Amino acid sequence: LSDIITLDDINGDIHMHTTYSDGAFSIRHMVEANIAKGYHFMVITDHSQSLKVANGLQVERLLRQNEEIKKLNQEYQEIDIYSGTEMDILPDGSLDYDDDVLAQLDYVIAAIHQSFNQSEADIMKRLEHACRNPYVRHIAHPTGRIIGKRPGYQPNIEQLMQLAEETQTILEINANPKRLDLNADIVKKYPNVKLTINTDAHHTDHLEFMKYGVATAQKGFVTKDRVINTLSREDFKKFIANNIKMKK
């Protein structure tokens, strides 16, 4: 049990939003809040173009944000700031940006935010399409549940876990107390799947949610070595250096 993850093991938060989409704070504010947490790296992952309700980024705005992140990176030595996206997996299974756009980002998350009522087969087709894309590193809140509000889109968990393992796609424990998705039971049952614990912060205060995600992981006996945001600054840089996840 000595290797079970603790809050002190977390070296960065890699899913968060800014005023570019539906977040409350600028990139700079988020950077300073992450530095205040003592983090060594962070990824800015605003919503993608089809999620209009969340002010999703058209390609041109995404690339403009990318430039702003590069400038801020030169300014702040104490943290590495990476460009990313929380990209929608569309109802037909296609992804919200083309690969040539994804190639320009440091880190790509994919997520389902619409058409939750599809059949399990259709949902799995969407998730499979995302997992098999060479740029998609991780799937956010993999069941889509909101505690007390909606059950989510009911993927076939067994299939999703096999798929994640096969394609080396990371699955998220979303630390927002309304989500806690994946939950402790799932991460305990599938010990080989790589994880990341993130706050999905839409406000600087939300960075404090990390403790709920870590508590969920602890309940699921998750060891530190399964969670990619426990990597050191250097190792995380190496991990995402070539942008494309390694294909078996």
Spans of model-derived segments:
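Charged catalytic cores and adjacent phosphate/nucleic-acid-binding surfaces used
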Residues: 1-18, 27-44, 49-79, 91-248
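Conserved SAM-binding loop
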Residues: 22
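Active-site catalytic microenvironments in core metabolic enzymes, especially phosphate/sugar-handling
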Residues: 84-87, 212
